[in-house]
Regions:
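Low-complexity, glycine/proline-biased repetitive segments and flexible coils/loops
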Residues: 1-99
Length: 99
């Protein structure tokens, strides 16, 4: 059976651990993580939650809890039954330059 799933909400992790570790000093940059993927349907199917705005956290259902790429702010997708969710959205990259 084909199932549908909701789309992830807007990003909520405004300042990730990676951001905290790299956002000081001249010419520094950091990745602002966002929300995780939407929760998939409880029944098996092909639907998968999309990552929230800004990427960020993990999917909220079972096998969909795949983390995004390290240090990029990318988020995991929501699961759908026994299927893995799709990849989350991209993170927001902020770079500061000395003037």
């Amino acid at each position: 059976a084909t199932s549908t799933s909701t789309v992830g909400g807007a990003g909520s992790n405004a300042h990730s651990a990676y951001a905290s570790a790299t956002s000081s000093g001249a010419n520094s940059g950091y990745y602002a993580g966002g929300g995780g993927g939407g929760r998939g349907s409880n029944s098996s199917g092909t639907g998968a939650g999309a990552g929230g705005v800004g990427g960020g956290g993990q999917g909220e259902h079972g096998s969909g809890q795949a983390a995004g790429t390290t240090n990029t702010g990318g988020g995991g997708g929501g699961g759908s039954g026994e299927f893995n969710g799709s990849a989350g959205g991209s993170g927001i990259v902020i770079i500061r330059y000395a003037v």
